[in-house]
Amino acid sequence: MPPIKNKPSVFGEQLICDENDNVIGQEEILLVTASGISTEKVVKKVAEYNGICYPAHIDRSSFSILSNLGTIDEYFGFKCAEIYDILKEDELNKKHPYLEKLKILSDSDAHYLENMRIPQQIIDVPENNINAILDYLNKKEGDN
């Protein structure tokens, strides 16, 4: 990331919190800039840490992988994608048939608690823990 200093009045505070959500500092470098790491490298690196990486708010007209690249290629290795408006899923699948192979998630994209909306989607996992959620997300649509 380029060493650009954050302007909290413009971009908001970038707080560093401990495991108990206590604020322990602030990140001074602006984190919303582009990185020099390719998408495929990010996906692979996240997988090395047993995480999952997926493109967010792909239905948005700006700052989304679809608005920037025009497509989501199988090459990236995504197993799911997130859309803001779950009602747009069928429309997106028609324009981008590859999406039918992915699990589609939807959330509020809220950056503040007061902006969160009522959930439009619930995932069904056998246990209430992170491993069950990651197992669910790591399976492509149609996998058992």
Question: Where are the predicted features?
Answer:
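Surface-exposed cleft-lining segments at the edges of enzyme active sites
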Residues: 23-35
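Amphipathic coiled-coil/heptad-repeat helices and related helical stalk/stem segments
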Residues: 35-39, 65
